[in-house]
């Protein structure tokens, strides 16, 4: 009996170990690191949501859904370093997603050993700091949790439990609500269900997703004082439009640059998937009953649809990394069929090839990563945990390392409890660092607002005169519209320069420099 229990749970135990030794190990070292702009935006959303809701106010209707930030906003009710807390939450969700995906590949491949080799390799790639930075950079791994769980449940569907498609639909909808661009995965799943099971089962999937999706949207609308439901979706495209001028200039360049970065990181997995695809088609031509071509096309679609996101907005390497789960599914299918139809000697050679290729593919990047000073810590878990309570962001030695921290320290000294702040040029991280909030969603990023006003200085002057943020830090980044912001601020007649964040090549985020302006009428 004990032997059967151990064998039954062996895969789960190994999945947990693989997740901890790859995802956990790579991420935990970076948790105490300095603030960065991507995570700063999500952290600001959490800050704002908590501030509004805890004060009994409604969320401004023009704020995006940002469900991940909303459900984690409770950290602002605790006397801790919220940056660190949110990174810990992101790590825990990434561990959960890693375990679930291991189980998906184990089921798809039918091999525990194959899963250990391939999933370990892909997790080392996907959790490299260059893609995830320091945690809570975006909602990708949070959305993976319901999506991978839906995949795992779908692999265990039989004629007696078709009711589970309601649950699968709900999980898929949750994944989309957490990260809106993943609606492409949702649509892919819907098409796959239709082809595999017919329209009656598809209806169950759609009903499940509708129940959870519309219920969640209903509460989100209530939190926004019953605003127009279309505003929630419009706000997502608002954010895309604020990058529109950059996308027009850099869309093609970014696509090729960052796709090549992703290919270089996972070239060995692409090779596995390519040969697996050829092998599956070879078997299909021999006898269609030998393989499930529908299943292959499902995994292929999962590998390709993330590319669509990079074609409609400015794409980066971490967007292309979302192709990896689909590629891994193709490789797992190929191994399962090879295990069924090939001789033992062939399987041994193929497995040896996979191991050698995985090591040669992962080793160069992982060795460079592990040679970074951040991985010299002897007690990374306790160090990251202690930063929850004793943050080094307020220590002068740490402040000197980052222009974000330098700017935040200056702004805090120049403000009081009731002050507000406006920034420009990827500086939203300053809101949670200073504890200040913008006067509105529009003034959260003045460059984005300026763009949406078609660079109309008069309109922006009127908005600043009407809303009067206490402090403005426009930064001097090389972005369209930034050079004209200082002129706009001066035209209001309301502000004076009170500090300068100097450019220094020896600090992190050195481009976050420039003048800090404050209302002339400010009273300390």
Residue ranges and their predicted role:
Residues 181, 226-227, 357-522:
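Extracytoplasmic
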């Amino acid at each position: 009996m004990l032997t059967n229990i151990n064998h039954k749970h062996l895969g789960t135990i190994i999945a947990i170990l693989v997740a901890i030794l790859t995802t956990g190990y790579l991420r935990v070292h970076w948790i105490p690191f300095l603030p960065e702009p991507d995570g700063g935006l999500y952290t600001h959303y959490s800050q704002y949501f908590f501030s509004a809701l805890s004060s009994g106010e409604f969320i401004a209707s023009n704020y995006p859904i940002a469900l991940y930030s909303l459900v984690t906003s409770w950290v602002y009710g605790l006397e801790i370093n919220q940056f660190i807390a949110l990174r810990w939450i992101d790590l825990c969700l990434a561990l959960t997603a890693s375990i679930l995906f291991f189980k998906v590949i184990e089921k798809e491949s039918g091999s525990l050993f194959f899963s250990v080799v391939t999933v370990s390799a892909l997790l080392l790639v996907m959790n490299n700091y260059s893609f995830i930075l320091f945690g809570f950079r975006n909602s990708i791994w949070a959305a993976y949790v319901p999506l991978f769980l839906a995949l795992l449940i779908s692999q265990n569907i039989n004629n007696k439990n078709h009711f589970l498609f309601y649950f699968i639909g709900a999980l898929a909808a949750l994944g989309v609500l957490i990260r809106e661009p993943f609606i492409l995965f949702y649509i892919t799943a819907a098409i796959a269900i239709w082809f595999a099971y017919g329209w009656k089962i598809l209806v169950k999937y759609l009903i499940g997703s509708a129940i959870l999706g519309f219920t969640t949207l209903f509460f989100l609308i209530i939190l926004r004082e019953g605003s127009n439901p279309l505003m929630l979706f419009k706000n997502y495209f608002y954010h895309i439009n604020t990058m529109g001028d950059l996308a027009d200039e850099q869309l093609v360049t970014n696509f090729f640059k960052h796709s090549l970065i992703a290919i270089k990181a996972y070239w060995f997995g692409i090779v596995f998937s390519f040969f697996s695809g050829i092998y599956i088609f070879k078997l299909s031509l021999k006898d269609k009953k030998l393989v499930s071509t529908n299943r292959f096309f499902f995994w292929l679609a999962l590998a390709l649809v993330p590319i669509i996101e990079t074609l409609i907005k400015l794409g980066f390497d971490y967007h292309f990394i979302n192709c990896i789960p689909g590629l891994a599914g193709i490789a797992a299918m190929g191994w399962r069929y090879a295990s069924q139809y090939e001789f033992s000697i062939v399987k041994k050679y193929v497995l040896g090839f996979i191991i050698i290729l995985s090591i040669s593919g992962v080793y160069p990047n992982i060795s460079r990563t592990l040679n970074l000073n951040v991985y010299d810590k002897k007690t990374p878990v306790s160090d990251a945990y202690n930063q929850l309570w004793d943050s080094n962001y307020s220590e002068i030695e740490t402040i000197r390392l980052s222009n974000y921290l330098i700017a935040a320290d200056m702004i805090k000294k120049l403000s009081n409890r009731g002050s507000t702040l406006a920034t420009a040029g990827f500086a939203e991280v300053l809101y949670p660092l200073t504890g200040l909030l913008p006067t509105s969603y529009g003034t959260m990023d003045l460059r984005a607002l300026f763009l949406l006003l078609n660079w109309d200085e008069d309109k922006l002057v009127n908005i600043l005169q009407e809303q009067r943020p206490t402090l403005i830090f426009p930064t001097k980044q090389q972005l369209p519209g930034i050079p004209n912001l200082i002129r706009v601020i001066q035209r209001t007649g309301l502000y004076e320069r009170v500090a300068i964040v100097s450019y220094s090549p020896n600090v992190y985020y050195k481009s976050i420099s420039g003048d800090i302006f404050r209302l002339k009428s400010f009273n300390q």
